[in-house]
């Protein structure tokens, strides 16, 4: 009898400081008990103070990476983060359309917290019209959700506005939308999960007061991807209830990771630094609660 772990794939850029991108995704995949694989789209010079330079990877080489992974390993679930260009968006769309990515989560990374643009302007329309329809789940934050709807859409300011935007994003074709409320200012963070079958549910967590929020979006989408891969080994289909369970588990993990790292001071220049979350909170003993 042969066995294997759930296999997950991250399509994203690098982060040499280890807090976001491919590096955060691999840590999260391991923490959530899957075997992580990668397709790297860009080499990014960044740290806890922001992005300083992006070096895009040639599209042909990205395609070669895809073939190296997908031609050899049965991927159960995939997430994409930084894609960068229209050509890369279209390449990922092609791979998703081939049915080789498993359950596919799109984290629509567009602009870094530091303000550095991570998606070319002409690629935004390709994300809206081509990438979203092949996604099983998209995980935009409030600014990203507004931009995915239209160039002049305002950010949602209320829970009801979030629900409305999540429903409107569903009209662009993804199987589900997780609209993240972390960019709000309330004491509680509310995230909205809307699925194509008409279900809408809220997830609520106390806001963790910390500067160490670097890579939270990457970590959450990777955790959801891993949870779906694990649950997919137990269920024949990822319906709304199973997806809701995966999202809930991932949000709980992120809350623990944020809380554990809330008081970390990693940077040699701490003023204005945004450190990472504690990806290993569940697997390394001795972490402060």
Model regions and ranges:
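Short glycine/threonine-rich catalytic loop with a Thr-x-Gly-x-Asp
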Residues: 16-19, 207-224
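Charged C-terminal helix
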Residues: 5, 53, 235-238, 244-289
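Conserved N-terminal subdomain of the carbohydrate kinase-like
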Residues: 2-10, 22, 27-118, 274-288
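Glycine- and other small-residue-rich loops at beta-strand/loop junctions that grip anionic moieties
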Residues: 14, 80-81, 116, 180, ...
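Conserved phosphate/ATP/ADP-binding segment of small-molecule kinases
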Residues: 121-200, 228-244
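Acidic-glycine-rich active-site phosphate/pyrophosphate-binding loop
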Residues: 1-5, 10, 21, 187-203
